[in-house]
Amino acid sequence: MKITPDDIRHVAKLARLDIAETDINAFVSQIGEILDYVDTLNQVATENVEPMAHAISLTNAFREDTVREAGPVEKILNNAPAAADNMFCVPKIIE
């Protein structure tokens, strides 16, 4: 698939990206290389490959949850940048 400068401008507009006109040709080249690589990957025979979530088998090491004392509240709160009324103070992030 051949990528054109107009394709780059169109995708940039859709993504609301401000790309300098001087960078358009570099993106044409880079995205062209990426699509060529994807095309190469599409040629790999994967019909008999079982779908997987990870390339290697992983096993989770679970343990039982146990309730225990956390420690002295004052000592824990001393590690916080800000605390009040035995609670951590955090900046407001939602209006």
UniProtKB/Swiss-Prot annotation:
Domain of life assignment: Bacteria
EC number: 6.3.5.-
GO biological process, any: translation
Keywords (A to Z) from UniProt: ATP-binding, Ligase, Nucleotide-binding, Protein biosynthesis
Record-linked InterPro entries: Asp/Glu-ADT_sf_sub_c, GatC
Pfam family membership, one: GatC
Record has Nucleotidyltransferase as a keyword: no
Primary role: Allows the formation of correctly charged Asn-tRNA(Asn) or Gln-tRNA(Gln) through the transamidation of misacylated Asp-tRNA(Asn) or Glu-tRNA(Gln) in organisms which lack either or both of asparaginyl-tRNA or glutaminyl-tRNA synthetases. The reaction takes place in the presence of glutamine and ATP through an activated phospho-Asp-tRNA(Asn) or phospho-Glu-tRNA(Gln).
Subunit field text: Heterotrimer of A, B and C subunits.
Annotated family: Belongs to the GatC family.
Protein name, entry field: Aspartyl/glutamyl-tRNA(Asn/Gln) amidotransferase subunit C
